[in-house]
Amino acid sequence: MKILVCVATCLAVGYYGSLATQSSVNTWFPTLEKPVFNPPNWLFAPVWTMLYILMGIAAGLVWDRYESDKYEVKNALVIFAAQLLLNLLWSILFFGLRNPMLAMLEIVVLLLIIYETHYKFKNISKMAGYLLVPYILWVGFATILNIAIWYLNREI
């Protein structure tokens, strides 16, 4: 049940982030210069859906260990919640406010907090740590992509 609650929470955050994205993905975003390694738009929804599911499973596995180490689990889940909120904030900054520079600064912080979450999770549940690796890799790629988009459009 804990895993289900965590997966549903992560998917809900993804849904709310998509609301900010929808307003600009077909209007403002196509007008931006993008690097050659920019993935096609259709790829983002399935990748993020899978990542939110993996994040939720990881958080549920950690939450399941609450009785064995309340302090560490609580600390890890607070950091997880912080990165989840930063994940949502990125969509608002980049697509909602149409501000790649602010989103770029925020995503660097997000990536660091995701890494901290991974570190905390793997010390509680190795599997939970492994489940966050695709998320770290994707947000690392998204960070490079965000920097490139900002750089290519900095005069706008």
What are these regions (language model features)?
Residues 23-36, 68, 153-156:
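Membrane-interface helix termini and inter-helical loops of multi-pass transporters
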Residues 1-20:
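N-terminal signal-anchor transmembrane alpha helix
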